[in-house]
Amino acid sequence: MTYIYNIYMSYSRGNLDRYIDQRLNRFYDQLISQRYAYSIPGIPGIKGDKGLTGSRIFLRNGIPQNELGTNGDLYINLLTDDLYFKNDSFWSLVGNLRGEKGEKGQLGIMGYKGEKGEIGSQGIKGMKGSDGLNGSTILFGQGLPRPYEGENGDVYIDKNTGIMYKKINGIWIPQVGLKGSQGDQGYKGDQGSKGDKGQKGEFGSAGFKGDKGDMGQKGETGAKGDKGDKGEGSKGSKGDVGNKGDKGNKGDKGIKGDKGSEGIKGDNGIKGDNGTKGDNGTKGDNGTKGDKGDIGDNGIKGDKGDIGDNGIKGDKGNKGDNGDKGNKGDKGDIGDKGMKGDKGDIGDKGDIGDKGMKGDKGDIGDKGMKGDNSTKGDKGDNGTKGDKGDNGIKGDKGDNGTKGDNGDNGTKGDKGDNGIKGDKGDKGTKGDKGDKGTKGDNGDKGTKGDNGIKGYKGDIGDKGIKGESGANADKGDKGIKGDKGDKGIKGDDGSKGDKGYNGEIGQKGDNGEKGDNGEKGDNGEKGDKGEKGDIGEKGDNGEKGDIGEKGNKGSKGDKGEIGSSILFGQGIPSPDLGNDGDIYIDDNTGILYKKLNGIWVPQTDIKGEKGDKGESGQSANKGDKGDKGNGGEIGNKGDKGSKGDIGDKGNKGDKGDGGIKGNKGDKGSKGDKGSKGDKGDKGDEGIKGDKGNKGDKGDKGDIGSQGIKGESGSAVFKGDKGTKGDKGNKGDKGNKGDKGTNGDKGNKGDKGSKGDKGTKGDKGIKGDKGDKGSKGNKGSKGDKGDKGDSGDKGDKGDKGSKGYKGDKGDKGSKGYKGDKGDKGIKGNTGSKGDKGSKGDKGEKGSKGNKGEKGEKGFKGEKGSKGEKGSKGNKGDKGDKGFKGDNGIKGNIGVKGDKGDSGIKGENGLKGDVGDKGIKGDKGNEGDKGDKGNKGEKGNRGDEGDKGIKGNKGDKGIKGSEGDKGIKGESGSKGDKGEKGNKGYKGDKGDKGNLGIKGDKGDKGIKGVKGTKGDKGTKGVKGTKGDKGDKGTNGDKGDKGIKGTNGDKGNKGLEGDKGNIGGKGDKGDKGDKGDKGDKGDKGVNGDKGSKGDKGDQGTKGETGLSIKGDKGDKGEFGLSIKGDKGVKGDQGYKGDKGDKGIKGDKGDKGIKGDQGIKGNKGDKGDKGNLGDKGDKGIKGDKGIKGDKGIKGDKGIKGDKGIKGDKGDKGIKGDKGDKGDKDDKGNKGDKGDKGDKGIKGDKGDKGDKGDQGDQGIKGESGASVFKGDKGDKGDKGDKGDKGDKGAKGDKGDKGDKGDQGIKGESGASVFKGDKGDTGSQGDKGIKGESGVSLNYVMSYYNATPGNFSSPVPVGASIAYVSTVGGGGGGSYFRRLNVGIVGGGGGGGGGALFRLPLSVMPGQSLSGVIGGPGLGAADSTTNATKGGDTIIYYGQYTFIAGGGNPGINSAADTASFIKGGDGGTVTNPLLTTQPTPGTGSTSTGSAGGNGQMSFYCFSGAGGGAGTSFTSSSGGNVGMFPGGNGVTTTYNNAGSGGGGASAFDKGGNGSIRFNPPSSGTKGSGGGGSVQGGGGTIPNDGYPGGNGGPGFVSIDYYSS
């Protein structure tokens, strides 16, 4: 049977000491005592309000930092077992859980049972406290927990072994054994004085009729029974003899327990009214939060734009406003509910809650004290029959019965004597009286009470002595405990056991009252979020102004995140048990586990040395405990007193006080968010002015656009993805971004006239190969344009020197992706005006020198980016830089208005993409992630233009191929889709640097196919890895110049994109050549306005972590989180609107264009593409002929700009792919090239702002995702604790902005990853994989000692190892003929055993060598060596496989195969059984077995005659094949498999046996056909050597 208890803990020094010292150490013993008292649940009371969120417990290495956790939380230093308590924002050392083993104390004198304390006056009903978080559930059972049991965070205690498991990510992971060493049994306390009990006994004489039964023998006298008439009382006097009443066992009759009806006390349950709070559900009004739309104001964040333009994302920081969602936080007010503590009275019922402690329940034994039940004794009246004469003496026992009358509880005091009473204990049945407990239902609130356990329960631990109670009489001693019973009053709460009704919590509705907070609902108006309006002038965002009053605490926010749960169980926790962040304590071993990323990882052993039973102390005085009766004001809980005994558990009830958290108070009005203030007109996007100096990275803005999906996998946290600096010189190949969606297939433009071949610009320096972006979606195959004349392959300009990648500015708001539209501008493409003559393709200008590519370094001034108002602050998340990742890609957010992308304004200057040069800081490329932009490769579509292939020339740069790693880009090949002009297959070249193969692009010209010659470069294909650099794909790097495209910056005016309208003349596209300047794409910055998308940010992290302000989320743990309530104001999240200002982020803008991808939705702008109608312009794609420009692809470094991919729509031009002839223009792919600007993707770094996604923060066990906090608002969901109330979760609605999906996985806090938000462009796909934050791996297969130092930053190690395989034996000539040798057994193995580690320490051990096969008939094969792992005081052994065994008898018909290796896993009480070697002539060796993190080895096949025997299997790895040689009928045995490889095959004549690998066994021998008899065979196969593989991750 599994018992489930919900524990809500409140902490005080005293309670902690009790909880740790008494409860844990004795809990197991109590459980084992099986002294469970069950009370018949009374009628459930109104469901009480949910209790306050409990405190959280942090388990980490080292001293806690004050910024960690919230007041009331606990912190355990796993290195020292020091316990800290947070109070007044500081962590104070409370003590050490590992205490010295105390000397066994002297048995204290059993004190007199104290008087039962007066039932305290009914306390004033406290304010209804906020619903607390659902506490961890403690499950009890026998044996391993079942996967489907419990929820993440729950604890399971295996009563058989004492092992505690915690459920993390659906898996029960062993944590610690609560069961300490069996303490010495305390001395049996002196039996308390029998007490006055006897008084009422007089009547009792009749009572024991049962006892009389004993007298029954005398029954003969029974006839005298007639005399019974005389019994009328006179005989009753004899009742005095009743003392004999001890026999009171008859007391069982105690059923009188019916008195339990008294349970009516349940009236206390009325407290349930609190439950009404359910109205809180109304909180839904908070949904009005829609005002969030106002968030546009948030735009202020725009300042962040300065960040590197991307920084705007920082506005997302406003997301903090999202925090307003916090209004839900008001739910935190429920914290006030803490007052509910009064409900604590019900808490008495809570005692049953204690049942959770079940062990304590033992105290219930005291219930035996229930002697009141003795009252049942009244049944004794039956005893009257006692007159039966002398039996009456038995009657004395009856007196005991009388006690029964006392049972009315009054006598209870006597119960103290109850020790003796113990017999009466049977009467304990009275427990039924517990029904009275019904009142207890009210007790549900009491559950809160469980916290009440307060540890006093620990005293119950003494109850261990109670064990004596088994004698029943001794139990009486336990009775002493009875004093605790006084608390029992609270006991009524005990009925609470019914808490199961918790479902009732639906009542939580009462919480609804908080609903008034709902007022915030007005904020709801925000609903219109409205237009997102014009991202507004981002302009004045500045005011953001009065976030003002924080408004009314607003409706109680969503329930705070459910705190970490503490689960108890016996044995290793099941994987499906508990949630990330939960703690599991193994009662068997005391090991404490924490669930991380779905895995229960052992943390520490809180069991400590079980001190000697310690001084039983003056248990005697325990009596005083009676005072507890006051129970605080809980007092009047009513008469339940009788039940009281069970009540002892009651203390738990007090937890209610935790409620006091109470007034978390009004979060402060937060006031009305104040009018969000008009989102100022987005003011003129302004000149976009010179790109000012990259201002300080503003505060990390709001999560901004949904942002990148962020890491998938279990990443612990992707870490901050720094902002991707400006893509300096063709910056490093960005990470392969996600394959962008195929853009709309552009109209097939007219085939422009083939422009003049531009002069080959100087080949720029091949920038670092950017990370290969994800293979973009294969764009729609544009109509194959007329194959333009293959333009002259322009000289591949010198690739400008890779400028310093400027600081990765904050990824602008992703600016208006729209701008990509201007691609039309694409430099001199000039007005593109009349396609007219296709102009001279302009000069392709000089390609403008590619500007200086200016200092791109500075990424221009990015101008002041206007005032960008103050929002600047959050701007700094800026650095998230780190890919953030991908963030949710959010809703792509509103994509806001993409709107002003037009402003993109100046992109204007882009002007000097010139120095793109700085690329300098590719620096933050850190987020290689941005490579994601490469994702754009999607444009690959332009493969078409491969035509230019021309400049394959610079392929030389390919140098960066190094990034080939990126090969990923090959993915981009996806765009090969463009293959449409299959003819152009050429661009496949983009398949990566595939070598410059890109030039193969010229093949595009396919006419020019001759150029395909460059395909030769394909040889470079090797570089394919660089496909990422595909950018280099020739000077496509200059495409970077595309940078001139940078002027595309003016594109910013994308509004002018209208000009693209001119596109009609597609003809001019020829000038595309200028694409080069794209460099300034930097201006893309203004894209910043996208900022408004920020609102999506709200998704906040789904994660648990605070990640940010989520702090309000309060510590994930049991903490009150209450304050989070304040977050309630989140409602204002609307203000996030200010994020709108984020617009300024526009400066990022340049990249911003990509950023839009987030808005990719805006791809709609592609609508501008509508102008694409002019795609004709693409016709100029012929210009693409300038593919040479592609050289600038180097700019790709700006991949960041990938944002432009958004315009991928432009890809439409790809339609011109028809011009693929000009494929040279593929360089235009370069427009993807703009993706090149992607280099700016560096700005994507700003994507970092998505970092806010980072908030996703912790999904998993994270302690606190860090700032994710804003998601924190989601935190309010926390109240979900009342799960019933979950309704409130509704507020989560804001999540709408899913925005930052943030990290998925267990990441503790993806950190700023959020910034990736801007990625909007899937490009960031960034990194996938295990985001536990992989640190490094260690692998060693050399037999002997090894030591692997734990790397810096690592906290988790996954260890895989195997012992050496056994060697195969030699064949034999026996009477039955030639018998083949037996195969060796496979080694035992450990697989991905999770261990928590600490940098500076080392994992060491011994690697087992291979067993050697028998060399000849005179030698024996040897056993494989054991591989040993030393982990602190634990030793894990992967045993070596055993060798094939030679037979000593000439008459044998087989040679036995070796047995598989064993495994020694300290986590298991029973190790997996190894496969046995085969002994028969046809049966395979036994298969290896599997258990937690380990496998035993399989047995080897037997050597036989006429038949063969294969080795056993392990999982999917088969044993080696046995082989029979028909020449001499000798059959060899195959080696047994290991968990990592198949066994070696047996030998066949003329073919030697195979040796094992990775710990598998070697095959057996047979005659080789040569040599000298009897050693004319092959030596047996050797076993495979053992190895150790350790993967280190940070958590």
UniProtKB/Swiss-Prot annotation:
The keyword Ubl conjugation is assigned to this record: no
Keywords recorded for this protein, A-Z: Collagen, Glycoprotein, Hydroxylation, Repeat, Virion
Disulfide bonds: none
Region of interest: Disordered: 181-577, 604-1326, 1538-1585
Localisation: Virion
Chain intervals with Low complexity compositional bias: 181-190
Glycosylated residues, chain numbering: 87, 134, 274, 280, 286, 373, 382, 400, 409, 1345, 1420, 1545
Bias-annotated ranges (Basic and acidic residues): 191-200, 209-448, 456-466, 474-501, 510-561, 606-615, 622-702, 718-825, 832-883, 895-1041, 1048-1098, 1107-1151, 1159-1250, 1265-1300
Domain Collagen-like residues, every copy: 97-155, 175-233, 236-295, 299-358, 380-559, 608-907, 920-1039, 1043-1102, 1128-1307
Compositionally biased intervals (Gly residues): 1558-1585
One GO location term (cellular component): virion component
Principal subcellular localization: virion
Domain of life: Viruses
Post-translation changes: May be hydroxylated on lysine by the viral-encoded procollagen-lysine,2-oxoglutarate 5-dioxygenase.
InterPro entries, sorted: Collagen, Collagen_Structural_Proteins
Record-linked PANTHER family: COLLAGEN ALPHA-1(XXIII) CHAIN-LIKE ISOFORM X2, SI:CH211-266K2.1
Role of this protein: May participate in the formation of a layer of cross-linked glycosylated fibrils at the viral surface thus giving it a hairy-like appearance.
Name of the protein this chain belongs to: Collagen-like protein 2
Organism: Acanthamoeba polyphaga mimivirus
Record lineage: Viruses, Varidnaviria, Bamfordvirae, Nucleocytoviricota, Megaviricetes
